[in-house]
Amino acid sequence: MGSMAFHKSRLFLTFGDASEIWLSTLSHLTRKNYASGINFLVSLEILDLSETLIKAISLDHSESLFKIKSLDVFNGKVVSEASKQARAACYISFTKFLYRLTKGYIKPAIPLKDFGNTTFFKIRDKIKTESISKQEWTVFFEALRIVNYRDYLIGKLIVQGIRKLDEILSLRTDDLFFASNQISFRIKKRQNKETKILITFPISLMEELQKYTCGRNGRVFVSKIGIPVTTSQVAHNFRLAEFYSAMKIKITPRVLRASALIHLKQIGLKDEEIMRISCLSSRQSVCSYCSGEEVSPLVQTPPIL
């Protein structure tokens, strides 16, 4: 079968088939969010998962985006602008995938830029995630250490390395370099690409990790029966520590990371240094907390927090 005929034959896939293929190429969190987005588009009757992709050739993308952005109430609930933009992003990303899948037979959606009808625009300058002070997270960690030593180490790595929870839970013992007090993290980039970043940690924290792993191989953070730790297990122990330490806000891995970022800004670290440590993509991303090409492994040494 010729190449052109092969790509044209993909038009006989259903939207449901194509969406499953697309979602399988995404990272866990993105897949979860976009799966919800696809269901939303189906509920709005923008997509019919039983239809073949032939219908996509005649789809009016502008009308679809307008329908998403014009929605004020869905299932009895007010739809926020952030939610509308997230659903629009899902639709655009999906059509771009269909464009690649069919080698151009299906045209991708393009964000609207008409005055008063723009698909994407800045909603807020600040990240809504709450934060705590260094003194507060110190108290929280004291409680967490008693509740669960493993999750105490996870929390310390989040704060000290400015890392996301999934980056920590995916660590393997061969990512730990005790001789140099460094840890190699795999950072997910766009289009499922990965890069690595080497971060130097305080000797005391690395010694605690060495005692915890005790020479075993495989995943660093495991349960009592040796299986990888889940985010729900960490969340449960965080809630207990939050209660015992009498925190005024809900403490999540996201809150800890945001708190560490804000603290670095407060102690005078430059935006460029914070970007290198945290892997944030822009100064705007850094500032929002406070007022694609793969490269060689990066080495960062954040200040001791």
Swiss-Prot record:
Signal sequence bounds: none
Keyword terms of this UniProt record: DNA integration, DNA recombination, DNA-binding, Plasmid, Viral genome integration, Virus entry into host cell
Annotated InterPro entries: CB, DNA_brk_join_enz, Integrase-like_cat_sf, Integrase_catalytic
Domain of life (superkingdom): Bacteria
Effect of residue 28 to Y: In plasmid pCHL1
Domain Tyr recombinase residues, every copy: 127-305
GO terms, biological process: DNA integration; DNA recombination; establishment of integrated proviral latency; symbiont entry into host cell; viral genome integration into host DNA
Listed PROSITE patterns: CB (PS51900), TYR_RECOMBINASE (PS51898)
Domain Core-binding (CB): 13-99
GO MF annotation, one: DNA binding
Active site: 188, 257, 289
Family, per entry: Belongs to the 'phage' integrase family.
Additional note from the record: pGP7-D is required for growth within mammalian cells.
Protein name: Virulence plasmid integrase pGP7-D
